[in-house]
Amino acid sequence: MKSDLAIVILAAGRGTRMRSSTPKVLHNIAGLPMVAHVLRGAQLLKPCKTIVVFRDVRVEQYIRNTFPDVLTVAQSDALYGTGFGVFSAIPWIRSESYGNTYPNTRHESHAEYELDACDLDTCNPASDRLNDQESLKGGRHIHTKSGDVTNNKPFPSRVLILYADVPLVPFQLLEELVRKPLKQAVGAIVTTHLDNPKGYGRVMRDNLGSIAKIIEDSNILPEQSINEVNTGVGIFDTEYLQDALNKLLKCHIAHSPNQDCVTNQDCVTNQDCVTNQDCVTNQDCVTNQDCVPAAHTEAHVLSPKVIVTEQIHKKAESEHQHAGQWMCRQDTVGAQNTKEEMRLTDIVEYFYNNGLRVNSITTSDSELLLGVNNRVQLAKTEKILNDQIIKRWQLYGVTIKSPETTWIDSTVQLSEDVLILPGCILSGRTRIEEGAVIGPFATISDSFIGKNTIVKRAEIIDARIEEGAVIGPFAFIRPGTVIGKDSKVGTFVEIKQSNIGPESKVPHLSYIGDANIGSHVNIGAGNIFANYDGKLKHETCIDDGVKTGAGNVFVAPVKVGRGAYTGAGSVIRDDIEEGALSLTELKQKTIPKWAENRGDG
């Protein structure tokens, strides 16, 4: 049986504050793009479908290649705001396009949807279906002009909304949000409290505790001391969400003053409203009908429709002493939206003004729920995630001597009794088996490290180190290299695209490139494998049991037979047969008293 949950991940933000040519959600933290962390968490919830709303084609390409079961929907460059983002995904929530059925499906979304409610000119909530909760049960259908979406098919009843730039949302929190029944509510959002909420949308509640609206930071008055903020994570009933977005879109397109998007029943009568100058601040008034009498600012009169804090009450009473003066209503949906965008947060107020409840889950893990907008926040987020990763491995049985100087990607796999010394960086698809000692100051990426190996002050990239091998100090193991069991790669050795057999040694100051070295081989100090002729790379083959002298140069392609020896300083250009000794014979010439004759004294 399919899940009734769909997940929409918003990844269409421009990310200008990152000051980067790379899309914000593709910036890495702990080895993966931010959007990948969000998708991995989403998949654990086992939704019937996951939809990513994107703007940059590079985001789509990444998801196609990495998460083939995820649907991608393009948000038009002409449409701004999180509301438009979710609106773009609605048809594909309702369609039969499941990721596991239609992988790599890309859908264009340019607000071409036919709105089947009232015409724009008669957009009146008093007659709209949102004011008739019984009629809402039948739902409203939104479809594309292409006719891809079928109105009579079953579709997910709930939509979980996540943000691709909020990568640390705990799975336990998402699980609670999804499992907790909405009961009489149309949705639920996740909130948190911040000592300094600057920059985040504030959650305003009535004096019964119900969520009434979310106010953007730029619209908060100095008198409003609200530290409960919206994290952006929320779950909504699909039908109600679609209806709300339908209505908000119509009001947005019509460029109305937005007073039509709420009910006007809170005004005593329109004639009771006077002029905007009688409001607390003129800019807060959209129309006179949005005013309420200053004489009626007691909480029991305003609740639950009009949300005014105690600080505003006091200011109003001090500035408007005589009867008949008015205070500006603060609940006109979208009236304070200074940007040309449709915000998803406006649906909260829209629901409230139509008698529909939005629940909340409040968490103390505020640092895990804040978005990434710039490089400072990116670094902070990565540090938080790294601390979590280190703690998890410590609890699993890995000893990490210096958590403060150790960085481990989320994709790394460690085993029990691994010892990580200070200054190590483990990244990519690295896997380290039990008993290995890593560090100090080792960098390992996309590599396999076998049991009981030692890697000290070395860099290893896309390589395989078998059980019992010793690497370093100051060794550089490059891609395509395999170091055999119980082998040794010593100080200042670089190895690239080579196989080193079991119990072989490359102990000192050597470059090994494009080589196959057998077992029980000893490579003398200062050996160079000359593998490049200026156009092509060539291979050197060293058979089992070979011993090479110091300072050898092997000019590839060349083969050295089993058990052969080479003399110090030899340049090996030709193949050497099994068991032979090969020397580059240069007659030594000695000049007596040379230094004295030179005048060295």
From Swiss-Prot:
What's any GO biological process attached to this entry?
peptidoglycan biosynthetic process
What protein name is recorded for this chain? Answer: Bifunctional protein GlmU
Enzyme's top EC category: transferase
Q: Which CDD domains does the record cross-reference, listed alphabetically?
A: LbH_GlmU_C (cd03353)
Quaternary state and interactors = Homotrimer.
The residues the record assigns to binding Mg(2+) are: 165, 373
Please give the positions of the paired cysteines in each disulfide bond: none
**Gene3D superfamilies in the record, alphabetically?**
Hexapeptide repeat proteins (2.160.10.10), Spore Coat Polysaccharide Biosynthesis Protein SpsA, Chain A (3.90.550.10)
User: Which residue ranges are recorded for the region named Pyrophosphorylase?
Assistant: 1-375
- UniProt region (N-acetyltransferase), positions on chain: 397-601
Q: Which residues bind acetyl-CoA?
A: 525, 531-532, 568
Q: Per the record's keyword annotation, is Repeat included, yes or no?
A: yes
Give the family, as the similarity comment puts it: In the N-terminal section; belongs to the N-acetylglucosamine-1-phosphate uridyltransferase family.
Q: Which UniProt keywords apply?
A: Acyltransferase, Cell shape, Cell wall biogenesis/degradation, Cytoplasm, Magnesium, Metal-binding, Multifunctional enzyme, Nucleotidyltransferase, Peptidoglycan synthesis, Repeat, Transferase
Spell out the molecular function terms from Gene Ontology: glucosamine-1-phosphate N-acetyltransferase activity; magnesium ion binding; UDP-N-acetylglucosamine diphosphorylase activity
Q: What is its EC number?
A: 2.7.7.23, 2.3.1.157
Q: Which cofactor does it need?
A: Mg(2+)
Write down how the cofactor binds this protein.
Binds 1 Mg(2+) ion per subunit.
Reactions accelerated catalytically = alpha-D-glucosamine 1-phosphate + acetyl-CoA = N-acetyl-alpha-D-glucosamine 1-phosphate + CoA + H(+); N-acetyl-alpha-D-glucosamine 1-phosphate + UTP + H(+) = UDP-N-acetyl-alpha-D-glucosamine + diphosphate
Localized where?
Cytoplasm
Looking up PANTHER family in the UniProt record yields: BIFUNCTIONAL PROTEIN GLMU, NUCLEOTIDYL TRANSFERASE
Cellular component per GO, a single term: cytoplasm
Active site (record annotation) = 508
Q: In which pathway does it act?
A: Nucleotide-sugar biosynthesis; UDP-N-acetyl-alpha-D-glucosamine biosynthesis; N-acetyl-alpha-D-glucosamine 1-phosphate from alpha-D-glucosamine 6-phosphate (route II): step 2/2; Nucleotide-sugar biosynthesis; UDP-N-acetyl-alpha-D-glucosamine biosynthesis; UDP-N-acetyl-alpha-D-glucosamine from N-acetyl-alpha-D-glucosamine 1-phosphate: step 1/1; Bacterial outer membrane biogenesis; LPS lipid A biosynthesis
Q: Region labeled Linker — which residues?
A: 376-396
Record's function text: Catalyzes the last two sequential reactions in the de novo biosynthetic pathway for UDP-N-acetylglucosamine (UDP-GlcNAc). The C-terminal domain catalyzes the transfer of acetyl group from acetyl coenzyme A to glucosamine-1-phosphate (GlcN-1-P) to produce N-acetylglucosamine-1-phosphate (GlcNAc-1-P), which is converted into UDP-GlcNAc by the transfer of uridine 5-monophosphate (from uridine 5-triphosphate), a reaction catalyzed by the N-terminal domain.
